[in-house]
């Protein structure tokens, strides 16, 4: 799932790290996800339903809404559900949380 998330995000935002980014970029994404067994057969899960969060961070003066729109479209194109978006920013930076679901079949 991590590779799918990074592949969807990095054409829009070049830096995408799992959980925590400690680099120098002013614009970046982090992501996390939980797995829930799904698609049962022969008494076992044959797929995982993944609850995904992609966090987009950028400076206050950055035109973030267009990037958030492009991230939403990129996640949809990678077969995630259409993400909900929460503005979690504060007075130091813009922070948007995109939440969606995906299926990991392997």
Protein language model features and the residues they cover:
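Small/polar-rich, solvent-exposed N-terminal microdomains that initiate assembly or binding
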Residues: 1-41, 59, 67
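Acidic-leaning, charged glycine-interspersed low-complexity segments
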Residues: 68-106
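Glycine-rich loops and low-complexity Gly/Arg-rich segments
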Residues: 42-43, 54-58, 78-82
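Sterically constrained small-residue positions within well-ordered secondary structures
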Residues: 22, 45, 89-91
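Short intrinsically disordered coil segments
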Residues: 44-49, 69-73
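A general marker of short, structured functional hotspots
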Residues: 17, 24-29, 52-53, 76, ...
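Oligomerization/assembly interface segments of phage tail-like spikes and tubes
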Residues: 46-62, 94-103
């Amino acid at each position: 799932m991590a590779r799918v998330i990074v592949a969807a995000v990095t054409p829009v935002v070049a830096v995408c790290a799992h959980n925590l980014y400690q680099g120098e970029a002013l614009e970046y994404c982090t992501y996390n996800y939980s797995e829930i067994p799904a698609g049962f057969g022969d008494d076992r899960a044959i797929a995982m339903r993944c609850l995904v969060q992609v966090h987009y961070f950028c400076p206050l003066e950055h035109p973030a809404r267009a990037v958030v729109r492009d991230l939403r479209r990129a996640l949809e194109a990678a077969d995630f559900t259409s993400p909900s978006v929460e503005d979690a920013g504060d007075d130091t930076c813009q922070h948007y949380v995109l939440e969606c679901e995906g299926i990991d079949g392997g």
